[in-house]
Amino acid sequence: MPDHSLFRLRILPWCIALAMSGSYSSVWAEDDIQFDSRFLELKGDTKIDLKRFSSQGYVEPGKYNLQVQLNKQPLAEEYDIYWYAGEDDASKSYACLTPELVAQFGLKEDVAKNLQWSHDAKCLKSGQLEGMEIKADLSQSALVISLPQAYLEYTWPDWDPPSRWDDGISGIVADYSINAQTRHEENGGDDSNEISGNGTVGVNLGPWRMRADWQTNYQHTRSNDDDDEFSGDETQKKWEWSRYYAWRALPSLKAKLALGEDYLRSDIFDGFNYVGGSVSTDDQMLPPNLRGYAPDISGVAHTTAKVTVSQMGRVIYETQVPAGPFRIQDLGDSVSGTLHIRIEEQNGQVQEYDISTASMPYLTRPGQVRYKIMMGRPQEWGHHVEGEFFSGAEASWGIANGWSLYGGALGDENYQSAALGVGRDLSTFGAVAFDVTHSHTKLDKDTAYGKGSLDGNSFRVSYSKDFDQLNSRVTFAGYRFSEENFMTMSEYLDASDSGMVRTGNDKEMYTATYNQNFRDAGVSVYLNYTRHTYWDREEQTNYNIMLSHYFNMGSIRNVSISMTGYRYEYDNQADKGMYISLSMPWGDNSTVSYNGNYGSGTDSSQVGYFSRVDDATHYQLNVGTSDKHTSVDGYYSHDGSLAQVDFSANYHEGQYTSAGLSLQGGATLTAHGGALHRTQNMGGTRLLIDADGVADVPVEGNGAAVYTNMFGKAVVSDVNNYYRNQAYIDLNRLPENAEATQSVVQATLTEGAIGYRKFAVISGQKAMAVLRLSDGSHPPFGAEVKNDNEQTVGLVDDDGNVYLAGVKPGEHMSVFWSGVAHCDINLPDPLPADLFNGLLLPCQHKGNVAPITSPAVKPAIQEQTQRVTPTEPPTSISVNQ
């Protein structure tokens, strides 16, 4: 475990201050307090100026690097805060709140535009915000500000107002997901090797995000059947750039501008591919309780399988999953419309089905408007445009008392549709919405069953509710009925292109997602249900229902039993069955289980062992029977710093042997440096961490830790857009010769941003040294020793003794007091073997030690102990600043 003595030494002067005067406040006592410095038992004639401690709340004028806390919530970055003496009473000092700092408060627009400034517009003028209090807690290097909520924009836990959003830095991103599979048939048949992948490359320039998506597939098949007339080798390969696009955030409008190839994401109309542009209110910019629904994809894999999620032919997600039930919940709420799910089993079987992502009731806060404006040309796969120029718009207006009115229009020369709806926030009873959409379509008479035009209506009702008291949620429940002649834009385009009216004419759609946890009973229920009926073909029903029960069995705790029933239907073929699992703990981080899968003509049962090695690694082994044949399979997963790695292997007696490998990661490169890393959302938001060049520093975000590379850089990719994300150093796993004087950073990043945050980390050996000036004296008590990176590596104790961290052979350091570098020291090269035997270090005077004036607030505010000049007195700030 690393020694953190440096941290304790750094706060020593502030601990003395705290002991003498309590916390520093903007309200002070009138009388000064006198102290006897003899209690410090300093040797010789050492003097300490305790003037700054003799008045409660006094902070010596100068510059301080502090963490700013607004209403107990720290802002994302540290700030240089200047303190200056009061005009009427020099024993009091005041903080300068710069426009840059005040902009981070999230003040309401009418409040912010009426603020007045002093000191050449460098400091907030006093007395404007009644009830505002400022406290300096120097023991924690913090500036604590209390501000009435009435002045601030709407906030939510872990969500910041637009004033704190960070567009990040410019850079290059390249993310990928690669899946490789090999399969050998035991009794003839085909051996196959396949590699598939998809990813995103792009550039960030200021607020702009430019991206290109790609997908590829390589498949080699060799027949082992000599009697097969088609025996031999066959290779198929393809590479496609599937999409080119760009976007940027418009924070003042709480909207997003998107250009290029896109998929129409609408709360009212069905989606389709197009090339053009759009401006839309971005739900991600809204507080969490107002955001949309993120798709939840569930299914059951009979063996280790590759799951591919695509939309209109474009792969948007691909991963490997072990045998058993699975849920994919990290697609994000920007994915909408109809998704195609393909499950490729290791035994060669393929399951396919479609799901329609749900839309939450299109509600808006009273007095606000949510909107989308889009235009362009519809597009087929392969960047080919089809159809005429179209345009569309939709909006939701929060009227009052929980009511919202919404509607929209979409169309081109031959197709028009319009919608109107109303929504109601029922408070504790949830939210409900109802709308009707009318379509008018012109087609050639040959394609419309003898009709030149079609007119139809579609009716929809949706409901959403969180039952917090019951620990349950109806994520979505909805019903939609469409008349026979109603057409969506996508169906119109298909009909125009093929010269015939669609098949699979939608009639009714039911959809529901439900989740409930009965904590006292140890029971949880999950349900996902969709049912489609059509005017011209048979209905389709898909569902997945899971029931789990947790209980104790004697001395064995946390035993669980679960049952999953499922049905997935596609192209008149259905996969249905039941999956049963019983598991119990085996040691601290392991479980043993029995799993049975029954249905669809294939029954299997397995005994399994699951073990979590650490936060980043787990594996699973299964042995059992399938179709009366022995089966053995294994699955391994590791969330590494460079990539997420999944590996699987399967053996089925007399049938086949297979193996699979999945890699998901990326690379980020900026002017500040870059790193290879794992990734979750292709081309998405990330945070570049700089550990001052120190390698192997463990940094954690929302997932497993990543470690800095040889250049001291790492990328945390599991961050959320427009959320207050936090990354921190795991101090218990720091390298032996590393010290972290700052271990937590925060960032609220716009979509696709490359955030940049720097940790104060010192690397090197530790030493106990004695500093001596050229006249034989020593630097004063409390003097700071800094390296060439201006990192404080030690504080001078009595008689020139100092504990140094981050010591390196031949390194140059400077000693500061009164805010100025007075002398320099040079460490020997090589360093002596014993660094704790009072290493004597001469400190050479710099010669010019005059105080330095800060250009940022010149001339009214001076660095550290320099007093404000009498000829240019600052405007004093009242105690209620």
PLM region spans:
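Conserved, compact domain cores that house catalytic/ligand-binding motifs in diverse enzymes
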Residues: 164-228, 369-444, 466, 472, ...
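Feature captures outer-membrane beta-barrel proteins of Gram-negative bacteria and organelles
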Residues: 165, 193-207, 234-251, 387-401, ...
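Short, ordered, surface-exposed loop/turn motifs in non-cytosolic proteins
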Residues: 60-69, 73-83, 693-703, 775-789
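Post-signal-peptide, soluble extracytosolic/periplasmic N-terminal scaffold domains
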Residues: 2-18, 28-291, 600-668, 678
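A short, amphipathic beta-strand motif
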Residues: 68, 297-299, 687-691, 765-774
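Transmembrane beta-barrel strands of outer-membrane/channel proteins
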Residues: 176-180, 212-216, 257-263, 373-377, ...
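Short Pro-Gly-centered beta-turn/loop motif in secreted/extracellular proteins
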Residues: 88-97, 331-336, 712-739, 751, ...
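Short, acidic Ser/Thr/Gly-rich low-complexity loop/linker segments typical of extracellular
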Residues: 80, 704-713, 790-801
